[in-house]
Amino acid sequence: MAVGKNKGLAKSGKKGLKKKIVDPFTRKDWYDVKAPSLFTNRDIGKTLVNRTAGTKIASDSLKGRVFEVSLADLQGESEAERSFRKFRLIAEEVQGRYLLTNFHGMDFTTDKLRSLVKKWQTLIECSVDVKTTDSYLLRVFCIGFTQKDQRSQRKTCYAQHTQVRAIRKKMTEIITKEISSGDLKEAVSKLIPDSIAKDIEKSCHSIYPIHEVYIRKVKVLKKPKFDMGKLLDMHGEGAVTKRVTTEDGTGVVISRPEGYEPPIQESV
């Protein structure tokens, strides 16, 4: 047995003492995520990012992040009536400590979608590619089910193939008409109460009674060139109003978006 000090262990011990444990969160900042003004609850959460260091700018890392939020949370509803609908919001601009988002899609939760499918009825689906007036290309998916007549003694309520085609055609026409007639802001405002699905249900009743009609999914396929003015228009109701007193004592009300930072002056 060798007697003496183990030089390797002694060296490794010294190196271990010199190491400093640095908390990674000391190099990060929190940013507030703001939803468009179409929704009741605009503060949807916070996100973390590394501070600007060298060529790595914090705002560049934040842009493009996608947040998925339940409609019940966006509308501030405690009931679970609309919690199965999820809106996707994408970060497009950073103003101060605020992250301004825009609509990036909509989807259903898997459990809700699976619960709709039942026996003894016909499932009718359609998908349409529609362009809004401000050049957003959306792919809209619609779903509906045939409804049993209360007076009928039959167990099933299957629709004929010609009726399914007629209903699908009517779905396509209504979706195209409603989405293409306005910009993205108007399209989102129609998706929140699902008014398009209600119109489809009423219009298709003459062909075959249907129920549980939903716009189940929306994808943003193409976007126009980024326009700061239109993004601020989506967040228009979130402007901060301040009262400034002039030299003669009169007050002037000014309106600025949340997170506004004044430009740097070249000279004073």
Swiss-Prot record:
An annotated GO BP: translation
Principal location: cytoplasm
Record InterPro entries: Ribosomal_eS1 (IPR001593), Ribosomal_eS1_CS (IPR018281), Ribosomal_eS1_euk (IPR027500)
Keyword flag Ribosomal protein: yes
SMART domains xref list: Ribosomal_S3Ae
One Gene Ontology MF term: structural constituent of ribosome
Pfam families in alphabetical order: Ribosomal_S3Ae
Quaternary organization: Component of the small ribosomal subunit. Mature ribosomes consist of a small (40S) and a large (60S) subunit. The 40S subunit contains about 33 different proteins and 1 molecule of RNA (18S). The 60S subunit contains about 49 different proteins and 3 molecules of RNA (28S, 5.8S and 5S).
Family: Belongs to the eukaryotic ribosomal protein eS1 family.
Protein name (record): Small ribosomal subunit protein eS1
Species, as recorded: Artemia franciscana (Brine shrimp)
